[in-house]
Amino acid sequence: MTHQVAVLHQDKKFDVSLRPKGLEEFYGQHHLKERLDLFLCAALQRGEVPGHCLFFGPPGLGKTSLAHIVAYTVGKGLVLASGPQLIKPSDLLGLLTSLQEGDVFFIDEIHRMGKVAEEYLYSAMEDFKVDITIDSGPGARSVRVDLAPFTLVGATTRSGMLSEPLRTRFAFSARLSYYSDQDLKEILVRSSHLLGIEADSSALLEIAKRSRGTPRLANHLLRWVRDFAQIREGNCINGDVAEKALAMLLIDDWGLNEIDIKLLTTIIDYYQGGPVGIKTLSVAVGEDIKTLEDVYEPFLILKGFIKKTPRGRMVTQLAYDHLKRHAKNLLSLGEGQ
C-alpha cells in the first residue's frame, strides 16, 4: 500500500468514525431534520417503505451521512453507488436486483449518471420493476422483473444538472446549507469527545469559525489542531493554540485558504477586480472549473467576497478591504452593470 493510499484510507476511517447514526446526533440543518423525521416516521407508522429522497448542496455538509441515517432509521441495509460508475443499464441491474425489501440505495453524485442508466432507473423508482433483455439479435426478447420495494437516496452538488423526470420522482427533496459557527462548534464538541481530544471552548469556536461552514472540514481541522498541539504545545488545546495551528495551514480568521486568496488577488491584480470569466480564472489559478464552482465560489459568494455578473466574476469592496487593497476599478465597474 502506497503512502498516499494509506493516508486516504485513514481519512476515510476517520470520517466514518465520526458519522452520526441517527438524526439526534446530526447537528444543524434544523428545518431539514424536522421534515425528514416526519417523512420517515409517517411511512414507518403506515408500514410502508419511505419514498425516495434527494439531498443537494455544497460538498461536505452531510449528504452521505443523511443516507446512512435514513437506513439506520428504517432499520434496513444500505447499498452504496456513485453516479459516474452508472453509465449503462447493466451497471444498475446487479445493484437493483440485490436489494432486499426496505433497503436504502444511495447514489452519490447522481447528476453524473449516464443518460441511458438514468432512464432505466425511472421504472425501478416508480413501479419497482425493470426490463431485462434476454439474448440478442432477432431472437432478443424483454422480460420484466419485479424488484423489492426500496428507498433511493440521491446526493448531488449540482441539482440544476438533474433532469426534470428524475427530479420529480423524489418524494422528499432538501437542500443542505452551510452551517453556523455555533452548529459547527456543537459538532466539534461531539467529535472531540469521540476522539478523546481535550480542547477548550475557545479552541473549538476558533476551529468552527475557520471551517467554511462545513462539518467535514471542521473535523479535519480538529485533527490537525490535535496533531499540532501534540508536537508543539504539550497537548494543550486552547484558542491561541488553535489559531497558531490554523495559521500554519494558511487559513485566515474568515476561513479563507491559500486558493481563496489566490483567486481574489488574481481577479484584483490581473483583471482590475473583474468581471472575468470562470474559464479564464480556472487557467489563471490552476484549478479546474468544477472545483472552483463547487468548492471555492459558493463560500466566497456567501461571505460577500465575490459576486457573479452576466459578464463574469467580480470581487467586492469587502474583498479589497480584507486584502488591504485599493479598489481602483470597483466603482466604475459597478456603475457599468
Swiss-Prot record:
It catalyses: ATP + H2O = ADP + phosphate + H(+). The gene is ruvB. GO terms for cellular component: cytoplasm; Holliday junction resolvase complex. One of its GO terms (molecular function) is four-way junction helicase activity. Homohexamer. Forms an RuvA(8)-RuvB(12)-Holliday junction (HJ) complex. HJ DNA is sandwiched between 2 RuvA tetramers; dsDNA enters through RuvA and exits via RuvB. An RuvB hexamer assembles on each DNA strand where it exits the tetramer. Each RuvB hexamer is contacted by two RuvA subunits (via domain III) on 2 adjacent RuvB subunits; this complex drives branch migration. In the full resolvosome a probable DNA-RuvA(4)-RuvB(12)-RuvC(2) complex forms which resolves the HJ. Residues 180-250 are annotated as: Small ATPAse domain (RuvB-S). It is an enzyme of class 3 (hydrolase). InterPro entries: AAA+_ATPase, AAA_lid_4, DNA_helicase_Holl-junc_RuvB, P-loop_NTPase, RuvB-like_N, RuvB_C, WH-like_DNA-bd_sf, WH_DNA-bd_sf. Has 3 domains, the large (RuvB-L) and small ATPase (RuvB-S) domains and the C-terminal head (RuvB-H) domain. The head domain binds DNA, while the ATPase domains jointly bind ATP, ADP or are empty depending on the state of the subunit in the translocation cycle. During a single DNA translocation step the structure of each domain remains the same, but their relative positions change. Its EC number is 3.6.4.-. The RuvA-RuvB-RuvC complex processes Holliday junction (HJ) DNA during genetic recombination and DNA repair, while the RuvA-RuvB complex plays an important role in the rescue of blocked DNA replication forks via replication fork reversal (RFR). RuvA specifically binds to HJ cruciform DNA, conferring on it an open structure. The RuvB hexamer acts as an ATP-dependent pump, pulling dsDNA into and through the RuvAB complex. RuvB forms 2 homohexamers on either side of HJ DNA bound by 1 or 2 RuvA tetramers; 4 subunits per hexamer contact DNA at a time. One of its GO terms (biological process) is DNA repair. PANTHER family: HOLLIDAY JUNCTION BRANCH MIGRATION COMPLEX SUBUNIT RUVB, PTHR42848. Gene3D superfamilies: 1.10.8.60, P-loop containing nucleotide triphosphate hydrolases, Winged helix-like DNA-binding domain superfamily/Winged helix DNA-binding domain. Its main location: cytoplasm. Mg(2+) binds at residue 64. It comes from Chlamydia pneumoniae. Residues 253-337 are annotated as: Head domain (RuvB-H). DNA binds at residues 308, 313. Residues 1-179 are annotated as: Large ATPase domain (RuvB-L). This is Holliday junction branch migration complex subunit RuvB. It comes from the Bacteria.
